[in-house]
Amino acid sequence: MASRTKTGLMETPRSKPSPPTPRVSKPTVTKSDGNSPSPVQSTRLSIDRSPQTVNSKPVSDRRTARVPTPPEANYFLIIICMAFQKSQSRLGKGTGLLVQQTQEDLRKANEQIERLKKDKAKALDDLKESEKLTKEANEKLREALAAQHHAEKSSEIEKFRAVELEQAGIEAVHKKEVSWKKEVESIRSQHALDISALLSTTEELHRIKQELAMTADAKNKALSHAEEATKIAENQAEKAEILSSELSRLKALVGSDEQKKSNEDDEVVSKLKSEIEMLRGKLEKVSILENTLKDQEESIELLHVDLQAAKMVESYANNLAAEWKNEVDKQVEESKELKTSASESLDLAMKQLEENNHALHEAELGNATLKEKVESLVTTIGRQENDLEESQHQVCISKEETSKLEKLVESIKSDLETTQGEKVRALLNEKTATSQIQNLLSEKTELATELENCKKEEEKIKKAMESLTLDLQEVSVEAKEAKEKLLTCQAELELCGVQIESLKLAEKDTNEKHGKMLEDARNEIDGLKSSLENTENEFFNSKTEWEQRELHLMLCVKKLEDGNFSVQEELSKVKNLLHLKEVEACAAKEEDAKMQTNRKELEEEIKDLQEIVEVAKADSMKLKESLVEKEDELKNTAAENRKLREMEVSSIDKIDQLSKVKESLVDKETKLQNIIQEAEELRVKEIDYLKKIEELSAAKESLVEKETKLLSTVQEAEELRRRELACLKKIEELSAVNERLVDKETKLQSSIQEVEVLKEREAENIKQIEELSLSNERLVEKEAKLQTVVQENEELREKESAYQKKIEELSKVDEIFADREAKLQSSTQENEELREREVAYLKKIEELAKLQENLLDKENELHDMVLEIEDLKAKDSLAEKKIEELSNLNKSLLVKESELQDVVFENEKLKSKEALSLKTTEELSDVKQTLADKEKELKTAVVENEKLKAQAASSFQKIEELKNLKQSLLDKENELEGVFQANEELKAKEASSLKKIDELLHLEQSWIDKGNENQELKVREASAAKRIEELSKMKESLLDKELQTVIHDNYELKAREASALKKIEELSKLLEEASSTHEKGEEITNTNPFDNSTGEQKVQESPLEAIDRHLKDDTTIHWSAHNVQVIGKGEKGKDKDTVESEVYHLEKREASSERDTEHDFAEEEVDSKAEGSENFDQLSNGLSLAEQTEDVVSKDQQQKKKKPLLRKFGNLLKKKSSSQK
């Protein structure tokens, strides 16, 4: 506000038309005729010019000297009084001339009054222009209101954008839900596949059960056939022995027949061997079927494990769904709360805007200083009225003291000389002042540039403003003291006060107008120099004119007497006007008191605003920190979401891998089904073949059963090892899955905690927003007050226009009134400047709105600016020192400057507060945007939750379906339990294997290394499957051949029996002759019971011992047979005792060898079991061992089948040799 008054006071002298008057009076100096009383005119004009020159000085000093003051008017009146006295003393000399001169002076005064009227008209035009400016300012205010409406519309647009962003977030949530649905569907599909696999396995188990039953029946039939075959073979062996005895007798006669028979026997042996190999092939097929059964049981167990894992996954999915539901409900509630808080924050922001507008209006209350200035003008007018009263008294005294004019003239001459000296001094002072002013202007330009920078940076110096407020309070106290001093010093320092006011106003004006003012000041200084030269010339002319006036004073006295009457009439009018002005002065004083009270209230409000601004700053800093923290949290949540997505991708990949594994298992199952179908076809064929072999398979049932048991134990061990490997792998996979799930749970818990923290922070932010809303309401109230102040300013302007009209009426008195009118014009210019400043303020408000965006960047530069401010303060201190040197004439006026500066600082503080309020509004707008974003996120979360609910409902339905399937599976499992009861021995072995599994858990690392070996085993399995298929084909071909050979052998045996019977009949006739041979036959019968007993023992022996005995004694049998043949052929002449001893030793050797083989076989069984436990860790080589064992078993079976035939053949040879002997 002070700056407005400064510019107004400084710009008033430009409109003043006073300087041209002295130039008009120059030609009057040359005229000295009687028609044109030049001396009187020159004296009058010189007297008139003297105050004008004084007025021109202030113009040159540029607001340092104001318009002529009342003391100059007094001086003019004194000169008039002296003229009256001289005229009274010289009444006889020239009263007529004086009357003419006074008339001419009156004419000139009238001309000056007309000029003043013209100036008044110009001032009125200026007032009209100022009114136009006010209208423009009002239009700009309207534009500002329109801008506010535009801002509101833009805020609505931002709301719509926020809604669009929310919709985009909702779409993203939809996408996520779709992805979750796909995952759930994939899991369900996997469950369905598992269930289908279980069903297929159960069906296969039923089929396998049926096949086992069929194979068991076939085995029984085959064993019965084998027993029948063994019986037939024994009968045939007995017959062969009889025949061999008979053939030995008839050997000499029928040597060729014996050779044929031996060849036939060999053929029989070969046929029997082929039959035994066929039986072994069938046994191998049965063992293969048992292996397939075991594999399928293992697959069933694996499927059970998978079911359990699926159950775990389902339970975990249900838990996750429940947790997601809870989180969704919480997020919905939070979204509702955030919506309410956002609406409240918007309302609060609108309130803050209204409060800022009120603050702007309150800032305009600073215009109250205009009232004080008007009152100061009224006081000056009152003083001038007092001076007029004194002049009237002096006129009365002049009538009484006409006799004393001569003395006064002499005193006037002395005064003139003193005034000349004073004028010379004043000229010197003016020169020094001009030089100082130039220096000050140069300094002030620098200060002005620095002040502009300071003004731009005042918003950055918020901390320094607090210290300035304290200084302002001190300055206000000093201003009050200075006002008290002013009242005492104004009477004494009226003349000096005008000059000092003009200087200070010029200084203030220079601070605002910078370089332009320098040029104006230089031009004015040039004008002042010319005016000083003119005044010097006029002074010399005035001396001559005074001498001439002394001659014409007598003439002027008469004219003055006539003019006194008119002057008295004018004085009466002036008195009336003075009374009116006194009444107005009283009213102005009352208004001053009101303004002071209003000013105090404004200072208190400013303090409150400062506190509010500080609180708003702290709140804004907190909001910024909270926003930064929220941004960091959003980044962390985004990173966690990315990690979760990566984990999901990895889990999906693993699921794909598991699906591939399942597909491979399905392929294997299809292969197994194909194999089973082929086995069924083979079974059909075997049934046909078994019907033919039932007679031969009875004797070998026990051996086959034990062999199958051994093979089953080996295969079970291998299967158990495989199951253990599969279980361990699945356990590892499940453990990894569980760890991932645990990690996800921890991450979800951390995210939930972060959401709770965000909620707490949002609550804090809402509280801060409520506090800001209260401060905004206060600002709105202050803006209302500012509007009232604006209205009061408008009323003051109207009053000022009324005062100007009154001043125009007073201007008729003389140049004094003209000077007063110039002051009024300066006030009008101040009003114009105020209007211009209002426009500038509006522009600045717009600029401040733009600067708000740059405030954050400029806060970092505050420290540098503080140093610059200190430099500026140093420069200001230097400038203040210079100003104090110039203003030593009156310190009280400096106090007024400080008051004006206080007002300026207050205005600047208000601006800074407005800027802070705008910042807070921007921050609130940012907070609104963040809240809008959060609302969008919450909406998306709500949509996702709804989708999740739908998915959860569908998942619950599917879970119910799965439960039903589980029940069906449980029923099937109950059915399978019946199957598992038959495998109690396997369960016992599984218990032992489980114990070993606990030990093998420590060897998990070794299993990882053996993964490659498992792959090789898979390759071997494939090759083994191919071999099995080839062997099955070979077996079918061999079975066909063997059956044909067996049938052919049976026919041959029957033919031989017939031929043998015939020969027996022929030989029976020869028995009577061979009595000695009969006795030997009895001895042979004695040995035969021994052999029979040994045979019975052999039958009583276990089939496993017989197998071992045949395996170990093959060589001994061949050796004994060879010896028997040698005995039969080469040693016919030995004694009976030697033959019997040899046979006895051979039988002992056979028995001992059989016992040794039994012992060795038992030891081999123990060793095989130990090796089975030791080789349990080497599951990768199980298939190769199985193949080796199968080869060994096949060889053993072949040897076993050969051994009894060889023994029987040896016995026959013995009998033949004995019979021959």
From Swiss-Prot:
UniProt keyword annotation of NADP present: no
Similarity field: Belongs to the WEB family.
Transit peptide: 1-82
Organism: Arabidopsis thaliana
Polar residues biased stretches: 32-58, 1084-1097, 1175-1187
GO annotation terms (biological process): reciprocal meiotic recombination
Keywords carried by this UniProt record: Chloroplast, Coiled coil, Plastid, Transit peptide
GO cellular component: chloroplast; microtubule associated complex
UniProt superkingdom: Eukaryota
Record region (Disordered): 1-68, 1073-1221
Bias kind Basic and acidic residues: ranges: 1073-1083, 1106-1116, 1129-1160
Protein name (record): WEB family protein At4g27595, chloroplastic
Predominant localisation class: plastid
Coiled coil: 95-149, 202-543, 587-1084
Record bears the keyword Cell membrane: no
Cell compartment(s), UniProt: Plastid, Chloroplast
